[in-house]
């Protein structure tokens, strides 16, 4: 039954991939395509989004484009994954369909590159940006691109910025001017780092077809197998569903992390604390120098094993014929984890938030996408989905040993209370109860206990950011993804309601969400508000679409005096309404940006000239400099608003 539900949801994935709200979402995607690729691409994409699925003659007729323009543009749009294509087995006709999801990710590309640069370094972000601009690319082609080589030259051994490389690579990328041989040495480890984190995947043929076409094609193949002809009825349907899901997974699987993950962590991935500056002082002083030397030797051996063997000197190149593309599903997981960390930072100490970040990063390495289904289930119908369990001992290895965990929580309970009543207890270093190691760091067992205490703080209401489980007698921690995704949606809606209608409306909404449908009298008793204020708030929120009123007649006469009026709060309907408004607002921002650009088109063309760009003070007059500053401020304002609205779309739809 579960497999049948998964297949049914997969078949309807195509409609969900069209962003649910077709009108404003399609308008937004058309603007994004035209903004990034020009008017020709925008015209073809608008035609496909308006008429949904077209063969080549109809697409040519509706778009009114000649073959010399249409065919090369279609090939380029398929390269950019903006258009699906599928050749029917019945009549041999090829049909084209707009890929709304890929078009929408154009608005999130800057945020993704910023995240990758923060995580893996500037050169990794450059490589990912190149792949993103090409749609997909062959490894051998990436080796020939001058921008990747020039980036290595500019960075002068980019290991200072690149989070995956150490001093050894700085020497190999030195100043001898022979950069042509060093570029592949840097490119291949960077590609391996991106693949190990899941940020790039292998391109498969099924990825050029819509999900619905892949489902129908896989089902046709499964039904045509000889062993299926002997089955009938329910057994046949179950076998078809199981075979279809398996074949679909096999055809669409582009995972490149196999062999690049060691003990649940990407090979060569530096622990968060290892990227700190070498001259940064420790939290606590070291005391026993003999023990310090031994510990330093062990740390050096571990770091060499972690970095050099697994990443820094892994000179095995990637397969030259491998074609890769950006894995947006995995990047959504990483961006969602960043939102969870921001949520945690609002109520816990920085030390606890850093422990939570280590947990989420471990989970991210083993999580391929935010949801198993395309559509978000309705409130109350969504089952809980826990992450993979992460052992507490593994987290103890990732948390910075210099991070002071003991002072950010309450005092530890002692197993044996002090028997000297009325006397001041001895200092910890006098009575022998000091739990620190020789170098001022907590001992292993005590450190693990402190991490467990911090995770226990995160598991407390109201957010319940973590969950504790016992697996084979070992303490593990997980994250309840669907619960936290709902929490993010609710917090976003509550923030909007409070900003529009005030804190009184927020109290009413929280009561309705917790209690369900209530009549006005019962709602007034629970919310402790005067009837006059309550009615004003309910009327304003009903006009804004945030609460609804249901009429329940007591008899068949349906008289107003014999009718019960129940107020209720439907977060699912409100989320859809907010998404529609958000798409519309993003479209208006892009349209306004285009209009403002057209007003000063000649001036902007002048500023984009190669001789003027970077030398504005020399070639532009004082009024032109003022106009340029005003334009940049206006552009930053509009694009910043689009990015902020994209955060809301991610919370409401993707996470």
From Swiss-Prot:
GO CC aspect terms: RNA polymerase III complex
Query: What is the disulfide pattern of this chain?
Result: none
Return the InterPro entries for the record. Answer: POLR3C_WHD, RNA_pol_III_RPC82-rel_HTH, RNA_pol_III_Rpc82_C, RPC3, WH-like_DNA-bd_sf, WH_DNA-bd_sf
For this UniProt entry, which segments traverse the membrane? none
Keyword Nucleus recorded: yes
Instruction: Give the main localization category.
Output: nucleus
Biased composition annotated in UniProt, kind: Acidic residues: 291-305
Region annotated Disordered, chain positions: 153-183, 270-305, 402-445
Q: Where is this region: Leucine-zipper?
A: 582-603
One GO BP annotation of this record: DNA-templated transcription
Q: Where is the composition biased (Polar residues)?
A: 405-417
Q: Which Pfam families match?
A: HTH_9 (PF08221), POLR3C_WHD (PF22536), RNA_pol_Rpc82 (PF05645)
Keyword field contains Nucleus: yes
Alphabetical list of Gene3D superfamilies matching this protein = Winged helix-like DNA-binding domain superfamily/Winged helix DNA-binding domain
Write out the similarity annotation. Answer: Belongs to the RNA polymerase beta chain family.
- Tell me the subunit arrangement: Component of the RNA polymerase III (Pol III) complex consisting of 17 subunits.
Which function does this protein serve? DNA-dependent RNA polymerase catalyzes the transcription of DNA into RNA using the four ribonucleoside triphosphates as substrates. Specific core component of RNA polymerase III which synthesizes small RNAs, such as 5S rRNA and tRNAs.
Protein name per UniProt? DNA-directed RNA polymerase III subunit rpc3
Its encoding gene is what?
rpc82
